[in-house]
Amino acid sequence: LVARMVPFFDVTAHGHGVEGLGDVAIIIAWTGGITACMAAMIAFVQNDIKKVLAYSTMSQLAYIFTGLGVSLWLFNNDHHHAAVIAFGASMFHLFNHAMAKGMLFMASGSVIHEMHHAHHHVSDPGDHDDDFDAQDMRNMGGLASKLPVTATAMAIGSASIIGLPLI
């Protein structure tokens, strides 16, 4: 939403709209920064694979939000070239994150499916009262040898998320 509002902020920065755009930009940047840190800390303590990915996504979207706030602040303070670079970096991160995280979510679905399959073959057929959670990462050791394609997809998605191809 903030990215779609950039043309509006461009108009307001030229005196045709709301005063105090710099304050709005700072609020956007700080909101994003605080949210990014909080969501990352929440993701860090999760055991459910999908919750880790979801909170990580929240953290990264907040990081992108911070970049957009900084871009608006730079634009408002007549650093137009730096503002364009910050905006472009935010949009690049958004696209890269969407593609890589989509791959990670699909691979996690494959892992969860395999965990259900493996558990049902090991457990007794009539034992439906156990507390097995196929999404709990504490139960997922040694899956790379059983799911080499999924492990490769996870490795590629993880490398893309951290920017490894660009380093």
Model feature map: region roles:
Residues L1-I167:
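Hydrophobic transmembrane alpha-helices and their helix-loop junctions in integral membrane proteins
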